[in-house]
A protein has these predicted regions:
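Active-site core of metal-dependent hydrolases
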Residues: 1-64
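Flexible loop residues that form catalytic
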Residues: 7-8, 79, 126, 156
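Structural motif corresponding to alpha-helix initiation and N-cap regions
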Residues: 11-12, 36-39, 86, 106-109, ...
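Short Asp/Glu-rich motifs
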Residues: 37, 64-65, 134, 170
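Short, conserved sequence motifs enriched in acidic/basic residues, glycine, and aromatics
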Residues: 9, 86, 163-166
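His/Asp/Glu-enriched, well-ordered alpha-helical/loop segment
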Residues: 43-127, 141-143
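Active-site microenvironment of metallo-dependent hydrolases
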Residues: 94-185
């Protein structure tokens, strides 16, 4: 039940140790790139049998809390490092859903199946951004960012029509900025 974040400098022996010990990796591609920390060999992780999920790493090293953006970054970084066959859009999305659940040891989430917990993020696919997309999953991943149209958590709407239902977004943003400034000083 151990997982490590980033893991951009693992040796082949480390990969074997992670796989043998069932240690997971939280891949944070945007943070790794922003900090110049290195490029995670995600394809090597997956081929070695290591559980891999995605993380946003927080606003100290990534100004976004957008997991779909991390899905896109994971796809682009993997392809930039290992070529076009390194990861598909669906494979990258899997890292952000089932992969994250697996890394956390949570088989009760990560996919839509009877008996599992189901938080849902729904994006519109009928706008100009995806008008020419032959594959809506690839289009959604590669043309990110998208504002979520509906977000359901534990069966309750949190976002509807792209707007927060039970909170004021401007108030949250102000409080977040103030807290981030306190941490920065």
């Amino acid at each position: 039940d151990v997982w490590c974040a980033h893991c951009v400098h693992l040796s082949p022996d480390d990969l074997a140790d992670f796989a043998d010990s069932d240690t997971g990796v939280a891949h944070c591609p945007t943070s790794n790139l922003r900090l110049g920390a290195g490029v995670a060999p995600v394809r090597d992780y997956v081929e070695s049998g290591i559980r891999v999920g995605l993380g946003v790493d927080g606003t100290a090293s990534n100004e976004r809390g957008d997991l779909l953006h991390e899905v896109k970054q994971a796809l682009l970084v993997a392809r930039g490092r290992d070529g076009p066959g390194a990861l598909t859009a669906r494979g990258a999305l899997r890292l952000g859903t089932r992969g994250g659940a697996s890394v956390l040891g949570r088989d009760d989430l990560g996919s839509l199946e009877p008996g599992k917990r189901a938080d849902l993020a729904i994006w519109r696919t009928d706008g100009l951004e995806l008008g020419g997309a032959a594959d809506l999953v690839a289009g959604l991943v590669l043309s990110a960012p998208h504002r979520v149209d509906r977000l359901v958590v534990e069966g309750e709407d949190v976002v509807r029509g792209g707007a927060l239902v039970r909170a004021d977004e401007a108030d949250i943003a102000r409080a977040h900025r103030a807290q981030a400034q306190r941490f920065a000083t």
